[in-house]
Amino acid sequence: VIGYGTSELPPFYTRKSGFGVDYELDTPEQLAKAFHVKRELGLRGGLLVTNPIPEAYSMDKEVIDKAIAEAVEDAKKDGIHGKATTPYLLAKIKDLTGGDSLDSNIQLVFNNARLGAAAAVELSKLEK
């Protein structure tokens, strides 16, 4: 597990979990080089890159933890399971946080797309 700019595994809505990652890389160039070397060595499998949510969209840990716990409890009470669980939880957490979790989720997606694109550009330079 690679942490992009972090030595901690970032949870979904916040930046810190207290759990370490195996490696910390700080630039798209470093990510591309790691993938390139792995490919050159013929190693199978992927690389899991964890990318923290931007600081401006990171939620207060106590607030989001409380919302998640309440949403999980409600899902149990409402008999939600299987593939219906994720959409139920996301909607419930959004309601419980007044929409803040949705804003955070959207920014997390944008941030991941930016990093993926930047790393892909750097990888293309290495594989010419």
What is the predicted role of each segment?
Residues 13-40:
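Anionic-ligand binding region
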Residues 4-9, 52-54, 114:
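Short, ordered loop/turn segments at secondary-structure junctions
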Residues 8-9, 43-46:
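Short coil/turn connectors at secondary-structure junctions
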Residues 11-16, 60-61, 121:
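Short acidic, glycine/serine/threonine-rich loops at helix termini
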Residues 46-111:
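A C-terminal functional module that forms or caps the active site or interfaces directly
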Residues 24, 55, 126:
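N-terminal loops that bind phosphate or other acidic moieties
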Residues 38-43, 101:
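Solvent-exposed alpha-helices and their adjacent loops that cap or buttress functional pockets
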Residues 64, 123-128:
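Terminal amphipathic helices with adjacent charged low-complexity linkers/tails
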